[in-house]
Amino acid sequence: MSETIVSMENICKSFPGVKALDHVHFELRSGEVMALLGENGAGKSTSINMMVGLLKPTSGNILFNGKDSSYLDEKEIGICPQDVVLWNNLTCFENLYMIGKMYDIPKKLLKERILKILEKLHLTDKKDELISSLSGGMKRRMNIAMATIHNPSIVVLDEPSEGLDPQSRRLLWDYILHQKELGHTVILTTHLMDEADMLSDRVAIIDHGKLLKLDTPKKLKQIIGNGDTVQLELDNHKDNEGIISELKTIGDLNNIFESDEKIILVLLDAVKKLPDIIHLVESKGSKIADISIRQNTLEDVFIELTGRQLRE
């Protein structure tokens, strides 16, 4: 099991008239990407602001490698805020150089690192361009470059792809996964289902200041909600009634019914059970003309836990 590097222990945070976090407890493991998934105001940004020392908890403890957060070396953490924070009157290279010098990175190493980061973020041709001339997507990529120029072991990203077009989002995702390849630990906040699903080793679903569930995306989709939907069409529709009766023995079956001469099954972890379903149908002498499956999604999980959809 990976080493725990950050522990949020029974954290509460209150503002006048609002309880932003309500007894939140989770651990961040070395080398993982964790997503905090929830709506605006759910408590995601409050959580990471406390992790990096920008806010103090009302109660509870935050530990880094088992020690109080006051022992945290600021060079070990990189923060990419939701708002773009760049010097518009400087070039891309100059922005990164200024930040690098603040972290006392040696001049030769800093220049090499800047060029590598710009290449990774597809910004090499913008090296000598003023920030003010960049598109919104390019500024977002520069924002994360500024947060990682000092090679931090922990990278904190607050809604990193907010408002990005699909191409810029993919470039940013590739860079986030590159941070994991380097052995860095990443925690990000998001309200985008596909972002949490694609990037995260684990997802924490937060709503109204409470941690509702924390697990891998795969496990969350396997165990929460009504499950996957399997649609079976038999060669002979007259077999449907008998096959439905037999399929009721399948484990974790939440529903089964006939619709438009097709058999519809709703069950958890259907992909794993698909061979058993096919074998059972064929063992009864029936033939499958067509089969399709719609897998449970993180959106389904979120709706099941909160009772509403998450905005996209």
What are these regions (language model features)?
Residues V52:
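Helix-to-loop junction immediately C-terminal to a conserved catalytic motif
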Residues G60-D73:
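Conserved ABC transporter NBD signature motif
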Residues Y97, K101, K108-K126:
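Conserved ABC ATPase "signature" region
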Residues L130-L134:
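Conserved ABC ATPase signature
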Residues V155-D158:
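Catalytic Walker B motif of ABC-type/P-loop ATPase nucleotide-binding domains
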Residues D174-L268:
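ABC transporter nucleotide-binding domain
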